[in-house]
A protein has these predicted regions:
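Acidic, polar-rich low-complexity tracts and alpha-helical solenoid repeat scaffolds
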Residues: 1-266, 270
Length: 271
């Protein structure tokens, strides 16, 4: 057992697997906690070898051997189900973890992974519930930051752009120095372009002290992109005229004015 752990700590997973397998083959009764731990480590070794079905089998043995301390094994069992694309089974096992181990240290991860499974299944409303629960219950956890990003993405994919903006802004304001905040700024940009509200994006970045992440040249490009998108969807030229007005020396004045002229000279001009 100790030799196997030494191999495991050194990432020699093949040797560790051999050691733990020999340990469980001769262990009869005795310390069930150690036996369950060995089963979990065998599961880990199979996981690192990408033998997910075998890993799931040994995590199940670990959880059954020491039920009272089986939250890690149950979480990993659910994770293996997801890696095998059995997302419904993954959700079922995570629900069991949440109910059976209400004080587990893996609950934050369980809510996140459950949200991921629902997202893959295109059950966006269920995913939203999971990410919101994660953020509400574990706001200071690292996984909550990732959950906030996922929440913004799912809202956006759901066509709920206002909610998406709020989710990304929460990540930026609650975790300002994090990598997730930097990603949220970039993702928020796409939402504001979709909303044709680049000015609001610039104003928001100024309000939270991140104006350096949106230089004038980028705002020029984003404003034109949003205006062109509006034009291409048949919604008139108001956004193009606004771009020309706000960026009199803009990099896209020629195509913007061209589109405006096209609309004014069309048989049924649109404003």
């Amino acid at each position: 057992y100790d030799w196997a752990y030494c191999q495991f700590k050194q990432h020699n997973f093949s040797q560790a697997l051999d050691g733990f397998s020999r340990y469980v083959s001769v262990q009869t009764g005795g310390n069930r906690s150690m036996l369950a731990d060995a089963y979990s480590r065998i599961g880990d070794c199979y996981y690192y070898a990408r033998r997910f079905a075998d890993a799931e089998q040994y995590y199940a043995r670990a959880q059954e051997t020491d039920v009272a301390n089986g939250d890690y094994a149950l979480f990993q069992k659910a994770f293996m189900a997801g890696l095998q694309r059995n997302h419904e089974r993954k959700i079922e096992l995570l629900d069991k973890l949440i109910v059976d181990y209400p004080r587990s240290g893996y609950l934050a991860n369980a809510w996140f992974e459950k949200g991921q499974a629902y997202t893959i299944l295109n059950r966006n409303n269920d995913a939203i519930v999971c990410y919101k629960q994660l953020i509400a219950d574990y706001p200071q956890s690292a996984i909550a930051r990732k959950g906030g990003l996922q929440l913004g993405m799912v809202y956006f994919n759901n066509g709920q752009t206002d909610e998406s903006v709020a989710a990304y802004q929460q990540v930026i304001e609650r975790y300002p120095t994090s990598e997730e905040a930097r990603i949220a700024v970039a993702d928020l940009k796409s939402v504001y372009v979709e909303k044709d509200a680049v000015d609001a994006y610039a104003n928001y970045l100024n309000s939270v002290g991140r104006s350096e992440q949106a230089p004038v040249s980028e705002l020029d490009s984003l404003s034109y992109m949003a205006a062109e998108r509006t034009y291409m969807t048949g919604k008139g030229i108001a956004s193009l005229k606004k771009y020309v007005r706000n960026y009199p020396s803009g990099a896209f004045l020629i195509p913007a004015n061209y589109y405006i002229c096209l609309l004014y000279t069309s048989p049924s001009p649109r404003d």
